[in-house]
Amino acid sequence: MITLKELYRIGYGPSSSHTMAPRKAATLFLERNPKAVRFEVTLYGSLAATGKGHMTDKAILDVLDELRTTIIWKPKTFLPYHPNGMKFQGFDAEGHITENWTVFSIGGGALGEEGKQNLTFEEIYPMNSATAILAWCMHTGKSYWEYVEECEGKDIWDYLAEVWNT
């Protein structure tokens, strides 16, 4: 199972799929292409169709810099893997492509690539069913919250308190 930090996220709104994930993708792309002088981001399908209202462009431009980034909107083009597709391209000073990366906002602020494992989920729970977890609790004499703390670490409670307060 994934960490509770993935399920309960504090992030850039108003939409986890249309702002949090595109912003995260832009951040990852910038980290991979720090020497790029210009960027081009193509938004496809649902991201392009409703992106202005969800501020998808603002989420991306806040990371990549409005002055050196072009956003291309293709609301009628749906990529085969998922309706929330994005293509990032970086360019060097001579205009050559430094990287071409297609990534998808697959829900809840998470990113995915066709044919690859999810890019953002962290699998930290060794047991994947309530039956297995309850059996562990019975066997160890511990409570469910102790299982959570064992897998997540003691800092999970501070994180969940921050989510609650937000």
Regions found by a protein language model. Name each.
Residues 8-26:
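Conserved phosphate/anionic-ligand binding catalytic regions in large, soluble enzymes, centered on
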Residues 29-40:
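Phosphate-handling active-site elements
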Residues 19-23, 54, 154-157, 161:
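Electropositive phosphate-/nucleotide-binding environments in soluble metabolic enzymes
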Residues 12-16, 46, 50, 153, ...:
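Hydrophobic alpha-helical scaffolding
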Residues 69-166:
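C-terminal regulatory domains involved in ligand/effector binding and gene-expression control
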Residues 22-29, 60, 64:
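Buried hydrophobic packing segments
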Residues 1-10, 40-41:
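Short, hydrophobic/aliphatic alpha-helical segments
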